[in-house]
Curated annotation (Swiss-Prot):
Gene Ontology annotations of biological process type: nucleotide metabolic process; thiamine metabolic process
Recorded GO MF terms: ITPase activity; metal ion binding; nucleotide binding; ribonucleoside triphosphate phosphatase activity
The protein's name in its UniProt record: Inosine/xanthosine triphosphatase
Job description of the protein: Phosphatase that hydrolyzes non-canonical purine nucleotides such as XTP and ITP to their respective diphosphate derivatives. Probably excludes non-canonical purines from DNA/RNA precursor pool, thus preventing their incorporation into DNA/RNA and avoiding chromosomal lesions.
Family affiliation: Belongs to the YjjX NTPase family.
Length: 175
C-alpha cells in the first residue's frame, strides 16, 4: 500500500488527490495522510512561477515532516493574469511530476479585490455568502454553475502529474 502525504488539510484538495491515486493505482491501494505545511509564498500567489514554487515548497516541507512516505503531493492555487489556476507537484524518492490545472477567468469585480491584496477564497466567500468556499466548490463551482468544482479540476491535474510514476517511458535514458 502506497503511503501518500497530502501537503494540505483542504478537503477539496485531499479528495482530488485520493480520487486520482485510486484511479491510477487501484481502489484501496493508498493510505492518505494530510499535513498543514507552509508554502513559502504569499497566501495569494500571483503568476505561474510563484504558484509552482508554493507547491514545490509544500512538498519539500511535507517530506521533512513525514520522510517515510512513498509520495508527497501539493496543490497550490494562484492567480495568473485574469484567471485562477493551480499547480500540482508530486514527488517520490526519485522523481517529480508536475501539472498545471485548467484556468478559470475571473470577473473584474472579484479580480479588483484580489489585486488589492485579498486572497480569492475570502473574496468569494463574501461574494457568495458561502463560508470557507475555498474548502468546498470554490470559484470554479460558482462560475461554472456547479458543472466543475475545485475537486474536479484539481483531480485532472493530479492525474496528469502522476503520469511519470506509472509510465515507463518517463524513466531516464540509460547511458
Amino acid at each position: 500500500m502506497h503511503q501518500v502525504v497530502c501537503a494540505t488539510t483542504n478537503p477539496a484538495k485531499i479528495q482530488a488527490i485520493l480520487q486520482a491515486f485510486h484511479e491510477i493505482f487501484g481502489e484501496g491501494s493508498c493510505h492518505i495522510a494530510s499535513v498543514a505545511v507552509e508554502s513559502g509564498v504569499p497566501e495569494q500567489p500571483f503568476g505561474s512561477e510563484e504558484t509552482r514554487a508554493g507547491a514545490r515548497n509544500r512538498v519539500a516541507n511535507a517530506r521533512r515532516l513525514l520522510p517515510e512516505a512513498d509520495f508527497w503531493v501539493a496543490i497550490e492555487a494562484g492567480i495568473d493574469g485574469d484567471s485562477t489556476f493551480s499547480w500540482v507537484v508530486i514527488e517520490n524518492t526519485s522523481q517529480r511530476g508536475e501539472a498545471r490545472s485548467a484556468t478559470l477567468p475571473l470577473p473584474a469585480v472579484i479580480l479588483e479585490k484580489v489585486r488589492e491584496g485579498e486572497a480569492l477564497g475570502p473574496v468569494m466567500s463574501r461574494y457568495t455568502g458561502i463560508d470557507e468556499i475555498g474548502r468546498k466548490e470554490g470559484a470554479i463551482g460558482v462560475f461554472t454553475a456547479g458543472k466543475l468544482t475545485r475537486t474536479s479540476v484539481y483531480h485532472q491535474a493530479v492525474i496528469l502529474a502522476l503520469s511519470p510514476f506509472h509510465n515507463a517511458v518517463y524513466q531516464p535514458l540509460q547511458a
